């Protein structure tokens, strides 16, 4: 944890959700569900007012969301136009005090883009241009510090949709940048965790339930997700059968590379 947040007595922070964006929900949602053996737990009708539709699938206790624009002029649509459809949209963290983390972000030059207050849920979204690569959101649900506790964005019974026979966990997020060390340090300052090194020597941010690895690439994007699965070959074959571009133990879907690990 960095000094600024340590001084403020900051508590826990965990990866709660990854959000991808696609021009249309289908076939992306059906592909993810079929290939990865996951189930949709919720479709939030409230996002329609933002010109969006969405679906969420639990990967153990982390939620994987896909959003798609339903009308012109949405933030998600602008993101697609800017990136050409490559790159994840949001990294969402649960914590004890989103407002404190929002204040800290402002102090280091990262603007707050949106505050969502739907009791018992409270979220602070940071400006993607200042975050670089993707949106960052911090949120907290009152009375729900348990990883299997209530989480309103995923619906009332999201836990019942957890399926672990094919995909067991989302264990890593890959971030790409021409300056991976600089992006890692920037995200580390925002989130409040120190930069370490991965087994392969890349800058890494370690959370209690996953890690962010930063690799060199032409543009700053969330480029990949790593999943622990029961049978790599079986999932890889399922991706091929759905028409995904497969390379080794990875395939492209929803604007990012899905990497498979045993």
Residue ranges and their predicted role:
Residues 26-39, 99-108, 179-194, 241:
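Amphipathic alpha-helical segments
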Residues 70-82, 142, 151:
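Short, flexible helix-coil linker/hinge segments at the edges of structured domains or between repeats
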Residues 2-8, 14-23, 55-60, 65, 77-172, ...:
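Vicinal oxygen chelate
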Residues 2-74:
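An N-terminus-focused feature that recognizes amino-terminal "leader" regions
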Residues 14-15, 19-25, 156-199, 210:
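Surface-exposed interaction/gating patches
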